[in-house]
Every structure is written in structure tokens, then in C-alpha cells.
Amino acid sequence: MIVGYVGRLAAEKRVDLLASLAHLPGVRLAVTGGGPMEEDLRAVLPTASFLGMRHGEDLARIYASLDIFVHTGPFETFGQTVQEAAASGLPVVAPAAGGPLDLVADGVTGYLVPPGDPGALTAAVSRLAADPALRAQFSQAARRRVLGRTWSALTDELLDHYEAVIDDATPVARLAA
């Protein structure tokens, strides 16, 4: 069972929380990315495989080799790696904060856990690791959920939000003039 993380290796990403998973039987950790905390994380996660920074086909192959994707950072505004993992058909365990709230349907495509809670993170990964049928169910649901989230669709959605704000603000601006 390969549990993976992809992202910047920086303190605010809380990759150190992966240490709570190292003792799970049959679980191997794969950490993809680089950053200022890499050396410290190698000490905290001595059994993890550190794969370095990857892009394109290399990154796609890494996602394809994972069984579960874990995102640990509580401050993501978008969560590109969460979306990439879901598009790769991976169940995702992520903090119930920021971007993952829009990308992970708790109990459907993965699990949302309290930010910074290693016990909840471990429990969620354990549940998925122990149940291949649940992983397969979440995998299919995750992929379906992000199929329509192309850059074009996201840009259109963002433009719609801007237009709504402008439309709402215009009457107020006219009154103030």
C-alpha cells in the first residue's frame, strides 16, 4: 500500500504529519517535491521514499503508482495536487480547510480531517488501507467529481463570480457618485 504526498516541502505544508502513518502495517510513504524542509523531513520520515521534484509524465506515473493520496497543508487556497490526485483516481485524505473543502467530498471521494490532527489523519488512512472496496469506490467518485474541472471551466466559473460581484457593486457605486 503506497500512500503519497506531492507538494512543496515547507513548514506550512505540515508534511511532518505523515510521521503518524509510518507505523501503519503494510503502508509505504512516498514524498514527491522539494523545499526548505526536505532535510528535516528525511529525519522525521526515515522510511519514506523521497522522490524529488517531478513534473509532467514523471509526476503522472507517480500518481498512478499511489493507492492513497494524503494532503497535509491546512492553508491551501486551491489545492492543485488534490485535484491532480482525484483526476488520477485516488482517494484523498486532506484537512477540512481551504481548497480541499471544495475538492474532497467527505466520505464519498475521500476524507476531510481536522487540520493538524495526526490521529484523525491516521484513522482515515487506516480505514482506506484496510478496505480495498472502499478505496475503489472513492477512486471512481473522485475521478467523476473532477472531470469537469478543466482550466477552461474554472476560468469561466471565476469570470461568473467576477461578473456577479461587478453587477452587485454597480448600483452602489452609482448611488455613491
Regions found by a protein language model. Give the residues of each.
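Short hydrophobic beta-strand element within catalytic cores of glycosyltransferases
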Residues: 91-94
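A conserved mid-protein helix/loop that constitutes part of the nucleotide-sugar donor-binding site
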Residues: 1-24, 36-40, 119
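Short alpha-helical donor nucleotide-sugar binding micro-motif in glycosyltransferases
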Residues: 54, 61-66, 158
